[in-house]
Structures are given as structure tokens and as C-alpha cells.
Curated annotation (Swiss-Prot):
This is DNA repair protein rad5. It is found in: Cytoplasm; Nucleus. A zinc finger (RING-type) spans 967-1012. Residues 34-43 have a biased composition (Low complexity).
Length: 1228
């Protein structure tokens, strides 16, 4: 007899109805403890029961859904009326007369139960959207004793005596349990299974071995076992040797809706399969073919892909035919658990209409099983290092999966009503609420971005190299954050460096050394009690399922652990790791961060390094064996070596300072860059080679990234590379650590993976302009729990973006305070002295007046940019066209430096080629040595040109001998700034130029004032006497003669800034023949033009920019430091903004302004820093009545707004950006 043919939902035995409903009632029962009888309730978020219990003559209206799949074979049934079915309960929860009649034999003497309230989800603040406002009836049932006749009346057939004996023996004298055991066949297993008992008070030992456990975890296991009630029956418990493929964790009720129509498709008690269709992983569109072995970057989630997210979860019958789908609210998170191989689900129908219609509501109970794969670690992945836009906050696929995983786990535990077995349940509830709010915030941000499309709403900052995230901090907020970090206690004890350190530290440096030593030596004692990691939660595996049946147990695995912030699961106890043994040295630039770290390296060595140093060199016969790797160890210890990661331009400086700060023979440094990388670091730095291991390895961020990329292609096999990631260093130091401020960049990810006992970062700006800048440093330092981005986002980012600034900034200050040591140059000691007594620094603005040709070019670019702004303002598209307007403003700034920078380079090259050809034909050049010209003219033997050459030679000799000669135009004697025409006639430079202008103004072709030959401005040469070269003469006893040259008039006048610079440098060379200077510009093409001018004027110079190799940079810096002659260093703003020590220079020339003066100040501080002994003068070249003057005004106004108005809304910021653009393109 098929039980489905004899029973329906309304007149079925109470025990059969109860066993298919969820175990939601008792928290003790859900957590794993037994209950006297199983509890049940309606599915989640069901409305009042009376809506389900409709009039027998009424018809249930189906929902309308676009996604419904109709079964055409059953369409004929849809036209029939519903059968009238007897009601089992009234609206107030009491039994109907029909039910009373059926149950009279055993309910006459029973007390009437109270109505049961509808089921509501616990710990869920927002109601779940359900497809229908219906719910199955719910009622409490009294417990009945087992009786043979009553039992057979319930099951509807005679039962053999041996079966009755087994059931009565194992049902605990409970008729409900007896009926359930008979109907689901449990009695058969009990009849055959051998009795196996488990002692819940002590863990079982499988295979004769038991894993070692700490005293704390053993005590925890004992207390947990004692808290578990003993089973009420003698049902045997199955013992598993290890974690099975899937393990039961709980059950819960859900709603679904049918996608088929027909009779008998789904009935109460039927099992259904919960399935997902296979989804395709996102692909990255790339041009061309990807090379084999190239690691794939994590794809970013596009707006279109975000809209196509498939969360459909289907329930199918045993044959695989789809019957319906889960409600969307439930499917949202159930689909995530299935897709990410965290859980699998089994379904049982609780309620379905006898004749099912499309879109009709079905109630299911889902049993959830945690998969073993969910407890396995995740593999190493790369991040996308490309910038998708200005300050774009794209969410990577990995981060989206993490967010969905977090929400899914939290919702699952809420549904099955499982709570942590350790810790404060109320605190856990609040933390989950905050985590869901953070996830909702991230989801809302992603949706807003998808709606916004590609609209560019960026500020006036220059385009960054990497996509950044988070709201920008205003200046007053930054000041508030640094206030605590900079409240330095001058009473801090001092520490003396080791005797191998060759330098003398200042008092404030000795105090920081004491602080750093204290941070590194704060080791956790071995006997300290092991505590659980604060981000993890402990949960107890259930020992009974929703039917109150015993579940299989795994010895020594009574609990599992969940990190709701990272979505990780573990079967092992997550220990609280030792807190950060390092920190952030954030002293302002010029206070000697490098020297302080070197003193730490000398003063704190590992025990292995100390013993190796005391033992001295080891003989070959006594060399220890090289290490072998066993077990799960992935790196080899390098107990004697500190790794320093710095920008490429600072590698040589680190090596030089490390050698200078160490006594001879006490310190070994190694450069790990370029050709020097061809070494086996594992063999060189391992403990077996401690006596010969380098004390410091210096490498660049680029090398770290390169080896990290290779590591990813090898699936994270660290030891195979024998490089940086194969070692666990004693210490790692990141210099200029703001290079890793973007947590999503590959460089940042690579640095996070460096293994080291102690971790330090050096930066003058821990927070550049976003709170996420600090998070990246905290993650590198591995500061628990803040290095978890989900935790950071929950307690810092979301409150800040929700305008709860006080809470967010207070939390950040608590993070900063124990980690950061920061001093500034304007700090004073208690006796009123500056920390570092530096010589004065004077900054002077040099006003530059553009020449007429330059002004013409500038006005053309200015009018075009202004017209573009006006057109977009009229159309209301200023922010859309911001990139175009910004590019035109950039061209405007370049025109202030040199008109050539904004001209078409191909046309310019053609013009220069034509001019050079004309000069070759005439024997002329921009810069000609007078003596060479005389010798050339004298050596001419051609009779046709001999006369002219003799005259030219005669004129040149007069110039050389300074023969008295008056100007033929103004009669001034001697001539003022003597100039020579191409036909070798002389006059005052100003007179000659005015004479030519007078003729061109009258539209006449200029002619020579003496011989009437045609002349032009390119044929006018100025006589230059190089008096400043006298001191370079090396001939002893000879009277020095100045070098004389003829330079084409206007060759240097094409740029007013270059003319001013040359004038300053020539004057400086006359006054200080051995002084060194810096010339800084953000445009490397402008530096090339300056270098040409310096060459023409015989001014010695060197150049350093980002295009140079590390060896070339090191050579330039060494030469600049060692030369004792007048020298100029041409420096690009980016290359000179970090880390360099250029105290040998005394003058700084800033050729063009940057958007923020703080960037210029970084470059200036390369000169004005500790070690500078002379006064420093800075000259900022600013063109009058230009965009450069207005840039300075915008900077000042923005500082005022930041400090006086504080945080502005997004709309206010947008308006401010437009005002900034208007200001830049306004007319003075």
C-alpha cells in the first residue's frame, strides 16, 4: 500500500505531520542537544495562519510569474474546481468537529492545547519577502504513551509482533516516535544494527592516536561533553573516523513556488532535490592570445554582468523533473552556499496543494549539510593592477564572492537558529547585524555604480596610477587622526644601539629605538593560555537531527569554527596569534627613518645570529646540513636576515647608508636586483649558513611583484622558486610604504605574502587621503583583527561613509596609537629646542613674464580650453567632459614652460631639419666658438671667398681683442651687448633688433644697415664672453683668457623660464663656483629642453628620472655627491619625491607647480633634511597672469574650505570641482 494514496495533509496522523517540520523551537535542540519531543513550526516569515485556512468552497488564486514553466499536459486539470477538503483546525487553533471525530478514540480525555503562534525568523531585522501570505497550520500536540491498538490505528494496518517489539523498545514509550519510526523504516536499521555506544564524556581515539590538544581545548571539550544531555533512547550512534563529505548542521522551513501544474506532482512528505544549474565562470576579455602559464588576473564585475546574476534554485522530483523554485529571498543566499561548495541541501515537502498550479506556493523543509570542501583553504590569487578609471571603486569577483559568502553563512545560521557555543550571544548578534549592514552597503554601492554608468565625477586631482577606493578625508580629519599619533612622550626611555653601529643617534632616535625594541621583543610566553581568535566563532555539531534521531559523530570534532568576516570555516581550533611584532615608523621626511631602522637591525638579532657571530666562521668539515622540508611547512627560516623593500631609486642609497652606519667587518649587505638575483636565497640565508648569511637583503617593489607573479603560476609552491617567497625572514621593512596603499594592486598583494617574524613599514604619510590607505599597511603588518577587510569595512568604512565620522575616526585612532611612532620637524623638546636643528629654508616665487610669441601660443590654448568649458556648461555636461577639459588645462600648463611642448612634434621636427640644413649651407650654428671660427676662416684657400673670409676673420679678431668700436646705429662706444649679422657687421644687440623690427613693421624685407644684404632674425648672433670659466683654467703660470662664443639671438629666448633659469645659474656660478643645485620639473620633455640650454651655456649637469635603470640612477647619485665642481641635477618630480638624500645641494629650482604643494615639499625636503648644514633657497618659477598663478589660489582656497567647513556632501564636492575649473580658466 502506498502511503501517499491513503493520506493527505489535512487528515493525516499528527505524528506524521510533526516529523517533517523544522527543529526551530528549542535553541538547545538545534545546537545539538536532545529534546523530549521534536518541535515544529510554520515555515519562515509566514503570515497569520488564518489566511491559509480558507473557506472550503473558495479557490486559491495562483501568482503570476514571468519565470514560470507551464506543463501543457496538465492544463485540462486547471479548469476543474478545487475539491472540498475537511479542515483540521479552526482559526483560533482548536480542532474542528471533523478532526475531533477522527481522533475521538485517543483525544477525548486530552486537555485542549493553546494556539501556537506563527513562526518568525530569529535575529533577522528585516522581513523576508515571500511569494504568498500563506502558512500551514501549527498546533501543539500532547505526548501519548505507546499502545499497540492505537499504533495500528494510526498506521492503518496490522503490524507483526517482532516489529512491534523493536519499535516499542526504541520509541521511548512515545507513540509519535513509534509511528515515525515505522513509516520511515528506521525500525529496520535498529533491527539489524549492532549496538555501538559512544562515551560523550571522553573523546574517542581512532587508530590508536589522538591529536595533541592544549589544556584549554581539552577543558573546553570536557565542559561541552558534560553539558550535552544523555540520549533518552538506546538508539546506537554511528562513529566516523574523520569528517565525512557532508555533515548535517540543521534544518529550516522555506517557501517555494511551482513551475508546473497537475495533480499528484508533489505531496506532503515527498523528498525533493535542491539543485542549481551549472553557472559559467566570468571570463576576461583580452586582445590576442594569452601565453601559456601566464597567471590570470581576478576579473572585475562589470555593470552588465552584475545585472545578469543567476540565483535561481530549483527543486526537482526524484526523476530530475523541475517542480518549482525557491523564493528569491531564500534563493539569494542558498544559491551562494551551493555555488561556492559550502553546503548541500535536501528537501522534504511540508505542504503542497493536491492539485498543483503554476506559481502556487509550496512549503518545504530543507536539511542542510556542510561539505568537507568548505573547510579547505583557498588558493593564492592575483589582483588586478590596472586602473579602470579615476578613483574607481570596482569590486573584484573575489570580493563579491566573499561578500555573498558572508551574508549566506549569517543567514543560514539565523534560519537554523544556531548560536555560538562560546562568547556573548548578544554581541555576536550585534556583530552579525553590523556585518549585514556593511554587505548591504557594498551591494548598494555596486548597484548605484551600475546605474550611474560611466559618468566621470572626479575631482581636480591628477589621474592616479591605480584605482583607489573609499571617500577622501578632509584636511581637518587628517589632522585629527595624526594628532594622537604625534603626541610624542619625550619622557620615553632611550636605548643605546649595539657596538657594531658606527653612528651616533640623536635623543629622539634613541627613544624610537627603545620603542622598536619593545615592539619586537614582546613575545608571547609559552605558558600563556591559548585563546581563540577574536574574529572566529565556535559552533557545536548537532548530535540529533530534526527528527530527534542520533547523528553520526566524529571523534575529537565536537565543534566547527566560522569566521563571519572572511567567510572561512575550520575544523581546527583557531588560535589567537601573537600580536604584531613590528609597527609603523612615520617620522616626517628628513628625520632619519633609515638610520633608525639600521640601528634596530644592529641592536636586535635572533638567537641563531648571535650564536653564529660568537662562533665565528665554521670549517668545511663542521658545516651543518642544509634544511629539509617536511610536513606542512612552506618556507625556510632565515633567522639572520632582514629584507628591505624600497623603490628602485633608493636601493643604492640603502646600501650606501647600511655600509656607512656599520663598523668594518660587522655587517653584510646584499643587493637583490637585476643580475644579482641569480643566487639561491634558501641556501644562502638558511640557518645552516647562519655564519655567512647576509644581514640585509635590499630589493625593489618590482622584484617582489615579479617573483609573486611567478609564484602564482606555480600554484603557490613557495620553495620551488628558491627566492624571496621561499624564506621566512627575521624582519621585513617596507620603505616608502605608501606604494602599497591600494590593497587591490598586485604590488600590495605581493608584499602581503612576504613571510617574516617582524614587520615594519616606513612612510611619512601613513594616510595619504583615504582611510583605506592605513588598512593596507595594517594588513601587511598582520594586526589582528584589523587586517581583515570585512572587519575593517564593518567598523570603520561603513560608519565613515554613513557620516558617522566620530565613531569611525575614533576607531582609527585606536588602531594608530599603538602602531605608529611619528615625529615632525617642527616638534620641540621640553627645553624648547627643535628635534633636528636645521638651517633656515627660504622659498621665493619668481615671477616670469612670457615673451610675445609665448603669450600668443598660451592665449590660443587658453581660449580653446575656455570655449570647451563654456560649451559644456551650456549643455550641463561639465563633469562628463572633465577628462577633455583636464587635458586642455594640462596643455595650458605646458605652454607656460615652453611653447614647443604643445606643438605637433612631427611638424616641429621638419622645421628643425630645414633650419639645420640652412645653417650647414651657411656654415653657421646656434652656438659657435669664436677661435674656431677664426681658424676656419683663416684656413680658407678658395679665391672666390677669400676676400669675404678675410673680412670676417678681421671682424672676429676685433671682437676677440675687444677693439674699440662704436655702434653704427646709436654711435655708442663701446657697443652694448655686441651682436653680429650674417654678413659680419656689428652693432648693439638692441639697436640691431629694433632696426629689423622697424623694417618688418613697414612690411619691408630687412636689409643690413651697412652692406644692404638681406638679413633675418636667425642670422643675428650675440657675442658671449664666458668670464665664469676663468677658474677652470688648468695652465699654471699662464694668464687666463676668457672663452668667447657667438650664440644665435633668440635660441634661448623661446622659453622665458629657461632664460630665467640660465640667468640664475650663471649668477650663482659666479658667486659660488662649487655650489650644487636641483632643477625639478614634472615634465621630462621640459627637462630635455633645459639640458640643451645648459649644454649651450657650458653648465655641467646630471639627470635622474623614472626612465633610468637602477645602476644608472646609482651612478648619477654617486657622481653628484662626490663632485666638487659646480653641478646641476635635473630631477623629475616623481623620481625626486621620495627617499633621496641630496643634502649636498643648496639651491632648488621648481620649474612648474603641482596641484598640491605637499608633493613639491617632498622634493624640497630631499635637500632640507637632517645632514644639511647650509642655508637652503628655493625658487618657484610662476608665470604671471597664467593658469599657474590661479593654481596657487585654488590650493589656498581648498585648504581654507577643508579646515573651516569640514566634510562636504557629494553634491557640494561636485559644485566645488566646477568652481575650481572655472577659477583655472578665468581671466585675471
Amino acid at each position: 500500500m502506498d502511503r501517499h494514496d491513503t493520506m493527505d495533509f489535512t487528515n493525516e496522523p499528527l505524528s506524521k505531520k510533526r516529523r517533517f517540520l523544522g527543529d526551530q523551537g528549542d535553541s538547545d535542540h538545534v545546537a545539538g542537544g536532545p529534546s523530549s519531543s521534536p518541535q515544529f513550526s510554520a515555515p519562515p516569515s509566514s503570515p497569520p495562519r488564518k489566511k491559509l485556512l480558507q473557506d472550503p468552497n473558495s479557490e486559491v488564486q495562483p501568482r503570476v510569474s514571468k519565470d514560470a514553466d507551464h506543463n501543457d499536459d496538465d492544463d485540462d486539470d486547471d479548469d476543474d474546481d478545487d475539491e472540498e477538503r475537511p479542515r483540521f483546525f479552526t482559526d483560533d487553533g482548536t480542532l474542528t468537529p471533523h478532526a475531533t471525530k477522527i481522533c475521538a478514540p485517543w483525544l477525548n480525555d486530552m486537555p485542549k492545547p493553546d494556539p501556537r503562534k506563527g513562526y518568525l525568523l530569529k535575529d533577522v531585522d528585516t522581513p523576508i519577502a515571500t511569494p504568498r501570505d500563506v502558512a500551514p497550520p501549527v498546533v501543539e500536540s500532547p505526548q501519548l504513551a505507546f499502545d499497540k491498538d492505537t499504533f495500528e490505528a494510526f498506521v492503518g494496518e496490522k503490524v507483526a509482533s517482532d516489529i512491534l517489539h523493536v519499535i516499542s523498545k526504541n520509541c521511548g514509550n512515545n507513540i509519535e516516535r513509534a509511528v515515525n519510526m515505522y513509516l520511515d523504516g528506521t525500525w529496520k536499521k535498529l533491527h539489524r544494527a549492532p549496538p555501538v555506544r559512544v562515551n560523550s564524556h571522553s573523546p574517542l581515539v581512532v587508530g590508536g592516536q589522538s591529536p595533541k590538544k592544549s589544556s584549554t581545548s581539552q577543558a573546553r571539550s570536557r565542559s561541552h561533553a558534560q553539558a550535552q544531555p544523555q540520549p533518552q533512547s538506546n538508539t546506537p550512534t554511528k562513529v566516523l573516523p574523520s569528517m565525512p563529505d557532508a555533515r548535517y548542521v540543521g534544518a529550516f522551513g522555506v517557501e517555494g513556488w511551482a513551475t508546473r501544474s497537475g495533480t499528484g506532482l508533489l505531496r506532503h512528505g515527498d523528498s525533493v532535490k535542491i539543485e542549481r544549474q551549472k553557472i559559467q565562470p566570468p571570463t576576461v576579455a583580452r586582445k590576442g592570445q594569452t601565453k601559456p602559464g601566464t597567471p590570470q588576473s581576478i576579473p572585475r564585475v562589470s555593470a552588465a554582468a552584475a545585472k545578469r546574476v543567476d540565483v535561481i534554485v530549483r527543486f526537482n522530483d526524484a526523476s530530475g523533473r523541475e517542480l518549482g523554485r525557491l523564493a528569491k529571498d531564500t534563493a539569494n543566499w542558498v544559491s551562494t552556499l551551493i555555488d561556492q561548495n559550502i553546503c548541500r541541501f535536501e528537501g522534504i515537502c511540508v505542504y503542497a496543494p493536491e492539485r498543483l498550479r503554476t506559481n502556487e506556493t509550496v512549503f518545504l523543509q530543507l536539511k542542510c549539510y556542510m561539505l568537507r570542501s568548505a573547510f579547505l583553504g583557498r588558493t593564492l590569487q592575483l589582483a588586478d593592477n590596472r586602473a579602470a578609471g579615476f578613483h574607481e571603486k570596482d569590486e573584484t569577483t573575489e570580493e563579491k564572492d566573499l561578500r555573498l559568502r558572508q551574508v549566506a553563512l549569517v543567514r543560514l545560521f539565523q534560519e537554523i537558529n544556531i548560536v555560538p557555543s562560546r562568547g556573548n550571544a548578544a554581541a555576536a548578534k550585534d556583530a552579525r547585524k553590523d556585518l549585514l549592514e556593511a554587505a548591504d552597503s557594498a551591494e548598494k554601492k555596486a548597484m548605484d555604480k551600475a546605474k550611474a554608468g560611466d559618468h566621470n565625477t572626479n575631482g581636480l586631482a591628477s589621474p592616479p596610477e591605480e584605482a583607489e577606493e573609499g571617500q577622501e578625508l578632509e584636511q581637518d580629519q587628517l589632522d585629527a587622526l595624526y594628532k594622537k599619533a604625534q603626541s610624542f612622550d619625550f619622557s620615553t626611555p632611550e636605548a643605546e644601539p649595539a657596538n657594531t653601529f658606527a653612528m651616533t643617534l640623536r635623543p629622539y632616535q634613541k627613544q624610537s629605538l627603545y620603542w622598536m625594541l619593545a615592539k619586537e621583543k614582546n613575545q608571547r610566553t609559552e605558558d600563556r593560555e591559548t585563546s581563540m581568535h577574536p574574529l572566529w566563532e565556535e559552533y557545536v555539531w548537532p548530535t540529533k537531527d530534526h527528527d530527534d534521531k542520533d547523528l553520526p559523530v566524529v571523534p575529537d570534532q565536537p565543534c566547527f569554527y566560522v569566521n563571519p568576516y572572511s567567510g572561512d570555516l575550520s575544523l581546527d581550533f583557531p588560535k589567537q596569534e601573537q600580536h604584531c611584532l613590528g609597527g609603523i615608523l612615520a617620522d616626517e621626511m628628513g628625520l632619519g627613518k633609515t638610520i633608525q631602522m639600521l640601528s634596530l637591525i644592529h641592536s636586535h638579532r635572533s638567537e641563531v645570529a648571535i650564536k653564529a657571530r660568537e662562533a665565528g666562521p665554521t670549517s668545511v668539515n663542521n658545516l651543518p646540513r642544509l634544511p629539509t622540508v617536511s610536513g606542512q611547512k612552506t618556507t625556510i627560516d632565515a633567522p639572520c636576515t632582514t629584507l628591505v623593500v624600497a623603490p628602485m631609486s633608493l636601493l643604492a642609497q640603502w646600501q650606501s647608508e647600511a655600509e656607512n652606519a656599520s663598523k668594518e667587518g660587522t655587517f653584510k649587505t646584499m643587493m637583490y636586483y637585476g643580475a644579482e638575483k641569480n643566487v639561491d636565497l634558501v641556501t644562502m640565508c638558511c640557518e645552516a649558513n647562519a655564519a655567512n648569511a647576509p644581514d640585509v637583503i635590499i630589493t625593489s617593489y618590482g622584484v617582489v611583484l615579479s617573483e609573486f607573479t611567478q609564484l602564482a603560476t606555480k600554484n603557490g609552491d613557495r620553495l620551488s622558486s628558491r627566492g624571496l617567497f621561499s624564506l621566512n625572514f627575521f624582519r621585513v621593512i617596507l620603505d616608502e610604504a605608501h606604494n602599497i596603499k591600494n590593497r587591490q594592486a598586485k604590488t600590495s598583494r605581493a608584499c602581503y605574502e612576504i613571510a617574516a617574524e617582524h614587520r615594519w613599514v616606513l612612510t611619512g604619510t601613513p594616510i595619504v587621503n583615504r582611510l583605506e590607505d592605513l588598512f593596507s599597511l595594517v594588513r601587511f603588518l598582520r594586526v589582528e583583527p584589523w587586517n581583515n577587510f570585512s572587519f575593517w569595512r564593518t567598523f570603520i568604512t561603513v560608519p565613515f561613509e554613513s557620516k558617522n565620522f566620530v565613531r569611525a575616526l575614533d576607531v582609527v585612532q585606536t588602531v594608530l596609537e599603538p602602531l605608529v611612532m611619528r615625529r615632525t620637524k617642527d616638534m620641540k623638546t621640553p627645553d624648547g629646542q627643535f628635534l633636528v636643528p636645521l638651517p633656515p629654508k627660504h622659498i621665493e616665487i619668481v615671477d616670469i613674464e612670457l615673451s610675445e610669441p609665448e603669450r600668443a601660443v598660451y592665449d590660443y590654448v587658453f581660449n580653446r580650453a575656455k570655449r570647451t568649458l563654456f560649451d559644456n556648461m551650456q549643455a550641463g555636461t561639465v563633469m562628463k567632459a572633465f577628462t577633455s577639459i583636464f587635458a586642455q588645462i594640462l596643455r595650458l600648463r605646458q605652454s607656460c614652460c615652453h611653447p614647443v611642448l604643445v606643438r605637433n612634434q612631427e611638424i616641429l621636427a621638419d622645421e628643425e631639419e630645414a633650419n639645420m640644413a640652412a645653417d650647414v649651407a651657411a656654415g653657421l650654428a646656434d652656438d659657435m666658438d669664436l677661435q674656431t671660427l677664426i681658424e676656419r676662416f683663416t684656413a680658407t684657400t678658395d679665391d672666390a671667398s677669400k676676400t669675404n673670409n678675410n673680412f670676417g676673420a678681421h671682424v672676429l679678431r676685433q671682437i676677440r681683442d675687444e677693439a674699440v668700436n662704436e655702434c653704427p646705429i646709436c654711435a655708442e662706444e663701446p657697443m652694448i651687448d655686441q651682436a653680429v649679422t650674417g654678413c659680419w657687421h656689428s652693432a648693439c644687440k638692441k639697436c640691431l633688433l629694433d632696426y629689423i623690427k622697424h623694417q618688418t613693421d613697414r612690411n619691408e624685407v630687412p636689409r643690413c644697415f651697412q652692406c644692404r644684404e638681406h638679413i633675418n632674425i636667425r642670422d643675428i648672433f650675440e657675442v658671449i664672453r664666458h668670464d665664469d670659466d676663468l677658474e677652470t683654467s688648468s695652465t699654471p703660470g699662464a694668464s687666463p683668457e676668457p672663452r668667447i662664443s657667438l650664440q644665435r639671438v633668440g635660441a634661448n629666448d623661446s622659453s622665458a623660464k629657461i632664460v630665467a633659469l640660465i640667468s640664475h645659474l650663471r649668477t650663482l656660478r659666479q658667486e659660488h663656483p662649487k655650489m650644487k643645485s636641483l632643477v625639478i620639473s614634472q615634465f621630462t620633455s621640459f627637462l630635455s629642453l633645459i639640458s640643451s640650454a645648459l649644454t649651450r651655456h657650458k653648465i655641467s649637469f646630471l639627470r635622474l628620472d623614472g626612465s633610468m635603470s637602477q645602476k644608472a640612477r646609482a651612478a648619477v647619485l654617486t657622481e653628484f655627491q662626490s663632485t666638487n665642481k659646480f653641478c646641476v641635477l635635473l630631477l623629475s618630480l616623481k623620481a625626486g619625491g621620495v627617499g633621496l638624500n641630496l643634502t649636498s645641494a643648496k639651491r632648488v629650482y621648481m620649474m612648474d607647480p603641482w596641484w598640491s604643494f605637499a608633493v613639491e615639499a617632498q622634493a624640497i625636503d630631499r635637500v632640507h633634511r637632517m645632514g644639511q648644514e647650509d642655508e637652503v633657497r628655493v625658487y618657484r618659477f610662476i608665470v604671471k597672469q597664467s593658469v599657474e598663478m590661479r593654481m596657487l589660489r585654488v590650493q589656498e582656497r581648498k585648504k581654507f574650505i577643508a579646515t573651516s567647513l569640514g566634510m562636504m556632501s557629494d553634491e557640494e564636492k561636485k559644485m566645488q570641482r566646477i568652481e575650481d575649473i572655472k577659477e583655472l580658466l578665468s581671466s585675471d
